Amino acid sequence: MCSIWLTFFLSFLILNTKAEQVYQTCADESFEPNDYWKQKMLCMAYRFNFYGYKSNSMYAFMDCTFIRVGWMDKGTRKWNVAKMAADMHASGFPDRTAELTEIEAMCNMEFRNKLGPMSYYRCIETSKQGPGEFKQMLRNREVEFFSKNQCQGVDLD
């Protein structure tokens, strides 16, 4: 009975945080309303295509998203594994704390002083279960964002 209430409570929390629409909010904070780069960032986020676009704008955008949802501490840039695991669980996935802790350790060894959302995302991408579940969690969290084609009229080449 307790686990049913916990599941309900966690689902309620993630539904409440969905309303913020983090991708759109971070893009709005980082760019002017009609800035082409803003739409380009949103398109890349929509496609989960963050490679090859290593600009200060992309890093700032990704920092904003990870900090705003609580997956990274702004000051230390440390990954908040517990928060991400809780968000994944609230999104319907099994507890992935152990897997995310392993990914964090691997990431710390590989990237050392260059840790941030781009490196964390890259580490998640190279894990066994990480990419599919992480992307689905984001789709569940950012329903409004992913329900619209963010790449219409955008050329990524």
UniProtKB/Swiss-Prot annotation:
GO terms for cellular component: extracellular region. Disruption phenotype: RNAi-mediated knockdown results in reduced neutrophil infiltration of the host skin at the bite site. Induction: Up-regulated following blood feeding. Its main location: secreted. Residues 1-19 form the signal peptide. InterPro entries: PBP_GOBP_sf. Keywords: Secreted, Signal. GO terms for molecular function: odorant binding. The keyword Secreted applies. Gene3D superfamilies: Pheromone/general odorant binding protein domain. SUPFAM superfamilies: Insect pheromone/odorant-binding proteins (SSF47565). It is found in: Secreted. Female salivary gland (at protein level). Interacts with mouse TLR1; the interaction promotes activation of canonical NF-kappa-B signaling in host macrophages. Interacts with human TLR1. Interacts with mouse TLR4; the interaction promotes activation of canonical NF-kappa-B signaling in host macrophages. Interacts with human TLR4. Belongs to the PBP/GOBP family. Activates MyD88-dependent canonical NF-kappa-B signaling in host macrophages via interaction with host TLR1 and TLR4; this drives the expression of neutrophil chemoattractants, followed by the subsequent influx of neutrophils and recruitment of myeloid cells at the bite site. Mice with dietary resveratrol supplementation, which attenuates activation of MyD88-dependent NF-kappa-B signaling induced by the protein, are less susceptible to Zika virus infection after mosquito bite. This is Neutrophil recruitment protein. It comes from Aedes aegypti.
